[in-house]
């Protein structure tokens, strides 16, 4: 009897602990985003991906659904509706949102009546108008032609930013009061991205971060090392800290080509360059459990073993919504930058994404160049440049950044932790496995054999391509065996019946 009582008591404790863990998880459930359309071939195309990257940079985990889905909203504390079509929000959603206790932002042309009542909202429609958007801090975008949008003419609460038109003058970009917010327009690659951040920060109560970083992508073992050295020297001479997205090495790491790659990255590191590891190139949408995790850990160890402190990760946005990539690929890193999608190859797509502790919002240098006014961004940004192909491109980038307040990524607290290695930065110092790194700007290249370079190239083509090669070999061998059996059987058949 006594044993039964003890077992029952332990069972109650376990159930209580599980429930408490579940409650904790639900209390920090992130943001639920609903959208009606991907807005292909319209002015709004790309705004969903932009919103997802913005929320990640704000430190928000995301659950994403289309209007046709029917998820449980009972535990959701933050909701964003993104309307790209002209159609109104379905009635079933209007009632559910009206009954919800969540903080709620509506983006688009037709806010539901209950939201208009809550915000005492009145709007005026404009079509084919040139508009200029300004943020709360005075950041101004270039004028753009908008097919149709609303201008807010009356509201309750706090107004954020401005939309200016030649015909109608200025009106607030967005408004917020208590648990409700509204913005009439949101597009990728214009000032509405940052104007919306002001509205969402006020609604969700999140802290503003305002660092600006310079990010150079496309660095890998096959980049022009002389150009990379020139880049590091030029940025260093101009006093501009920078971040390099460096491709991984996970096979043939003892080859001379790999060692020389590590050598140039050490040089970059000594010239105020921060190294982030870019994820492996994906060529095939499948991966056995643990394969990517092993590759990421090997790649981190290659850098660590060569005194290169990779302080975070870079990847296209879709990695954050893939069951394998987001878990095995991102697990070691507390810092990362999500880049716009270029070529999407999922293993298995999922509708929820995680958030890095630190994740600057990547914008192209061309887009950055269109902004004017007070260059105060409401979230951390990474002004992103592809690897420079010429000194002319390098000079243009340095001139663009020369008078800007560019931050040093190493001044933040970053941590990368695998089974084998721990890499950290603290107040500008770099540590690998609790040992401070001595920054060394002496280049000690080793002679590279052509054969080794070619082998290394094969090892870095893409970590899923090996499966393609394996399956191709299996299929060819199988067809060969079938052919041999067919010929053998045919001869037996002919021998039997010819007699």
What are these regions (language model features)?
Residues 30-38, 105-114, 239-333, 340-351, ...:
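Metal-dependent polysaccharide deacetylase catalytic core of the NodB/CE4 family, i.e.
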Residues 51-77, 88, 360-371:
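A short, well-structured beta->alpha microelement
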Residues 75-117, 272:
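Short alpha-beta junction capping motif
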Residues 76-77, 102-103, 117-130, 134-144, ...:
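A glycine-centered loop/beta-turn motif at secondary-structure junctions
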Residues 187-192, 196-269, 282:
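Active-site beta->alpha N-cap acidic-glycine motif
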Residues 203-204, 211-222, 306, 319, ...:
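Catalytic grooves of carbohydrate-active enzymes
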Residues 330-366, 408-415:
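His/Asp/Glu-enriched short active-site or ligand-binding loop at hydrolase and phosphoryl-transfer sites
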Residues 440-499:
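C-terminal single-pass membrane-anchor helix
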């Amino acid at each position: 009897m006594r044993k039964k009582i003890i077992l029952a008591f332990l069972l109650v404790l376990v159930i209580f602990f599980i429930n408490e863990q579940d409650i904790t998880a639900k209390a920090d459930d992130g943001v639920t985003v609903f959208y009606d359309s991907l807005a292909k071939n319209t002015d709004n195309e790309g705004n969903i991906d932009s919103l997802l990257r913005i929320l990640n940079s704000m430190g928000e985990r995301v659950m994403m659904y289309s209007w046709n889905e029917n998820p449980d909203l009972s535990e959701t504390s933050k909701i964003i509706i993104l309307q790209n079509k002209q159609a109104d929000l379905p009635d079933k959603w209007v009632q559910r949102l009206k009954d919800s206790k969540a903080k709620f932002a509506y983006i688009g042309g037709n806010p539901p009546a209950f939201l208009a009542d809550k915000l005492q909202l009145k709007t005026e429609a404009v079509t084919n108008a040139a508009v200029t958007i300004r943020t709360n801090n005075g950041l101004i975008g270039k004028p753009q032609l908008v097919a149709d949008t609303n201008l807010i003419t009356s509201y309750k609460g706090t107004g954020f930013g401005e939309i200016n038109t030649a015909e109608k003058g200025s009106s607030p970009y967005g408004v917020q009061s208590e648990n409700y917010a509204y913005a009439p327009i949101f597009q990728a690659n214009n000032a509405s991205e940052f104007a919306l951040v002001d509205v969402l920060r006020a609604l969700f109560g999140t802290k503003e971060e305002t660092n600006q970083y310079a990010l150079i992508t496309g660095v890998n073992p096959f980049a022009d090392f002389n150009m990379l050295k020139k880049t590091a020297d030029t940025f260093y001479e101009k006093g501009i800290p920078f971040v390099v997205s460096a491709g991984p090495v996970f096979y043939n790491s003892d080859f001379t080509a790999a060692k020389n790659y590590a050598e140039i990255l050490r040089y970059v590191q000594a010239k105020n360059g921060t190294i982030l590891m870019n994820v492996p190139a994906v060529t095939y949408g499948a991966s056995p459990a643990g394969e990517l995790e092993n590759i990421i850990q090997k790649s981190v160890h290659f850098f660590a073993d060569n005194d290169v402190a990779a302080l975070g990760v870079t990847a296209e946005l879709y990695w954050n919504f893939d069951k394998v990539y987001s878990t095995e690929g991102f697990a070691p890193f507390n810092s990362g930058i999500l880049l716009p999608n270029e070529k999407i190859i999922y293993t298995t797509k999922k509708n929820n994404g995680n958030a890095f502790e630190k994740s600057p919002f990547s914008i192209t240098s061309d887009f950055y160049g269109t902004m004017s006014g007070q260059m105060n961004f409401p979230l951390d940004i990474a002004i992103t440049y592809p690897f420079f192909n010429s000194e002319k491109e390098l000079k243009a980038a340095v001139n663009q950044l020369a008078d800007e307040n560019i931050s040093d990524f190493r001044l933040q607290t970053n941590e990368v932790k695998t089974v084998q290695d721990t890499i950290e930065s603290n107040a500008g110092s770099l540590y690998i496995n609790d040992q401070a790194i001595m920054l060394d700007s002496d280049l000690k290249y080793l002679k590279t054999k052509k054969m080794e370079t070619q082998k290394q190239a094969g090892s870095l083509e893409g970590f899923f391509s090996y499966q393609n090669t394996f399956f191709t070999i299996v299929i060819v061998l199988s067809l060969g065996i079938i052919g041999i059996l067919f010929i053998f059987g045919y001869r037996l058949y002919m021998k039997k019946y010819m007699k």
